[in-house]
């Protein structure tokens, strides 16, 4: 079956082919496409994603580090198998980012100074089950964060122009080599 409806494809298919200019960019199970995209095209095509350019500074079997000028230092609890000191892209899904009032975020399971960013809420979209936040990072770059509305009052916790801290687990980002 051919479809352009991502929700339909992800829910019905056991394998999905993502095409780019007539070529298969990736053929995989739906969860693999979403959680482990092969490249920036697939990451951006499937769902919503924040992508930041950086330099791979550490790449060992159990850990990796990417320095992203617009996001900060990103620690991963697994290796990347890329060339050390090369340009890579860090992809992180909006739902994998935790948002707290400014100064309260602490990246668990990560070295100090990694997997954390500061910013200010510049947009909010209440969608019923989730609220989507557009955050302007201190670097000036925007990042999207989604939070489930677990109770009727969750949406009141944050408002426009609030300063916030963001953090993410070291297994959440995906490093893309192309």
Predicted features by range, described:
Residues 3-72, 95:
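Internal alpha/beta loop-helix hairpins
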Residues 49, 58-178:
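Non-catalytic connector elements of ABC transporters
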């Amino acid at each position: 079956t051919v479809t352009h409806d991502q929700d339909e494809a992800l829910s019905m298919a056991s394998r999905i082919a993502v095409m780019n200019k007539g070529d298969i960019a990736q053929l995989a199970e739906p969860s693999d496409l979403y959680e482990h995209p092969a490249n920036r095209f697939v990451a951006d095509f499937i769902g919503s994603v924040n992508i930041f350019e950086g330099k791979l500074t550490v790449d060992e079997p159990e850990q990796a580090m990417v320095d992203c000028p617009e996001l900060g230092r990103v620690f991963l609890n697994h290796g990347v198998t890329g060339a050390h000191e090369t340009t890579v892209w860090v992809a992180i899904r909006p739902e994998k980012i935790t948002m707290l009032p400014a100064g309260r975020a602490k990246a668990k399971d990560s070295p100090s100074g990694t997997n954390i960013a500061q910013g200010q809420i510049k947009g909010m979209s209440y969608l019923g089950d989730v609220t989507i936040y557009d955050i302007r990072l201190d670097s000036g770059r925007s990042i999207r964060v989604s939070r489930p509305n677990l109770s009727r009052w969750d949406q009141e916790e944050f408002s426009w122009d609030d300063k916030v801290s963001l953090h993410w687990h070291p297994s959440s980002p995906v490093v893309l080599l192309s």
